[in-house]
Curated annotation (Swiss-Prot):
Annotated F-box domain residues: 50-105
Lineage of the species this protein comes from: Eukaryota, Viridiplantae, Streptophyta, Embryophyta, Tracheophyta
Gene Ontology terms: cellular component: nucleoplasm; plasma membrane; plastid
Keywords in alphabetical order: Cell membrane, Cytoplasm, Membrane, Nucleus, Plastid, Stress response
Name assigned to this protein: Tubby-like F-box protein 3
Tissue-level expression: Ubiquitous at low levels. Not detected in mature siliques.
Major subcellular location class: membrane
Family designation: Belongs to the TUB family.
UniProt note: phenotype after gene disruption: Reduced colonization of the roots by the mutualistic fungus Piriformospora indica.
Membrane topology category: Peripheral membrane protein
Description of what induces expression: Down-regulated by H(2)O(2) treatment.
Job description of the protein: Involved in abiotic stress signaling. Tethered to plasma membrane (PM) and probably bound to phosphatidylinositol 4,5-bisphosphate. Abiotic stresses (drought, salt, H(2)O(2)) trigger phospholipase C mediated PM dislogement and plastidial and nucleocytosolic relocation of TULP3.
Recorded superkingdom: Eukaryota
Length: 406
């Protein structure tokens, strides 16, 4: 039997095992994609009957590598996820084979949404807004969002208005978008005016993160992060909007301080922190904590201008790319390379602000762009050093009404 036939036979058996023993539930398409990845395994009896149970490790690794290389786009990439769900040995091999998005430009497992995007190329996504239930859905889609092409569901966010702020709860499962869900991965919180936002991650990015309880002054130092710690609120970014001097037709002025990413990450040879494991904890079994980095900059104290305290601490700061005036259209324009088709004050492109001195070529690269393509449909393209989760939260901040800025 040829190697190609071997792989095809393996895929067929994986599909049979998947239908009988477990549900991958990493759906593709809007009608079926409102699901969350479940790290389930095949019943032992079902797998023992398979001829793949006794396959030599070297041959198994070779077969899995062939599958990973050939199934590089969704929905066929679900076969890679299926392989990881067979048993612990298969999972470990697949985890070694599947590279992070920074190197592979692929989103495979849920943890990929918390890892920096690829270098030098944008991951093309789009956001669908449901006005009736104040929910936002993030999809991975290489084609125009306005086409009939269904995208791969990634994240969901639900808006909750409070007396003094607004929260956007973010989940891996759009059917259960709440703080108490075990698929909760973070949130975005705005101030009363909707001009300043804080992005919270449910788990720390930096192993040296310090934890503080909101109703107590006790400080708990964590020398290393345990995968068993409860989900909390770790600030990883702060977003501020300023007065729009270009008027209502120009893009909003915004600045993003990335607490978890050093400014050197965008320089040649620079690196950004990368999470390796998602924590799925039921918040009902833990006390309510609120977590803060010891050196994080609070949203209320964010200064304006590029020479802020954030840059003095060596944090990455993202700022608006300056638009140009279009004489024919009589409006301010940005080059979205065809990814944005409808003029909107929400449209923006973000680049890295230089730490000191003049801007280098790395500060001209668009790290995140967001824009409107139809009613309640928006494109979101991002790249290294930010993750899909961070990009999604920044884009969510653009949906809020900002009377004080316009």
């Amino acid at each position: 039997m040829s190697f190609k036939s071997l792989i095809q036979d393996m895929r067929g058996e994986l599909g049979s095992i998947s239908r009988k023993g477990f549900d991958v539930r990493f759906g593709y398409g809007r009608s079926r994609s409102q699901r969350v990845v479940q790290d389930t395994s095949v019943p032992v009896d079902a797998f023992k009957q398979s001829c793949w149970a006794s396959m030599p490790p070297e041959l198994l690794r070779d077969v899995l590598m062939r599958i990973e290389q050939s199934e590089d786009t969704w929905p066929s990439r679900k076969n890679v996820v299926s392989c990881a769900g067979v048993c612990r040995n298969w999972r470990e091999i697949v985890k070694e084979i599947v590279r992070v998005p920074e190197l592979s430009s692929k989103l495979t497992f849920p943890i990929s949404l918390k890892q920096p995007g690829p270098r030098g190329s944008l991951v093309q996504c789009y956001i669908m807004r449901n006005r009736s239930n104040q929910t936002y859905y993030l999809y991975l889609g290489l084609n125009q969002a306005a086409s009939n092409d269904d995208g791969k569901f990634l994240l969901a966010a639900k808006r909750f208005r409070r007396p003094t702020c607004t929260d956007y709860i973010i989940s891996l499962n759009c059917d259960d978008v709440s703080r108490g869900s075990n698929t909760y991965i973070g949130k975005l919180r705005s101030n009363f005016l909707g001009t300043k936002f804080t992005v919270y991650d449910a788990q720390p990015t930096n192993p040296g993160t310090q934890v503080t309880r909101t109703r107590s002054s006790r400080l708990l130092s964590l020398k290393q992060v345990s995968p068993r710690i409860p989900s909390g609120n770790y600030p990883v970014a702060h977003i501020s909007y300023e007065l729009n001097v270009l008027g209502s037709r120009g893009p909003r002025r915004m600045q993003c301080v990335m607490d978890a990413i050093p400014a050197s990450a965008v320089e040649p040879g620079g690196t950004a922190p990368t999470q390796t494991e998602l924590v799925h904890s039921n918040l009902d079994s833990f006390p309510s904590f609120s977590f803060f980095r010891s050196k994080s900059i609070r949203a209320e104290s964010l200064p304006s201008g590029p020479s802020s305290a954030a840059q003095k601490e060596g944090l990455l700061v993202l700022k608006n790319k300056a638009p140009r005036w279009h004489e024919q259209l009589q409006c301010w324009c940005l080059n979205f390379n065809g990814r944005v088709t409808v003029a909107s004050v929400k449209n923006f492109q973000l680049v890295a602000a230089p730490e000191n001195g003049p801007a280098g070529p790395e500060h001209e690269n668009v790290i995140l762009q967001f824009g409107k393509v139809g009613k309640d449909v928006f494109t979101m393209d991002y790249q290294y050093p930010i993750s899909a989760f961070q990009a999604f939260t920044i884009c969510l901040s653009s949906f809020d009404t900002k009377i004080a800025c316009e």
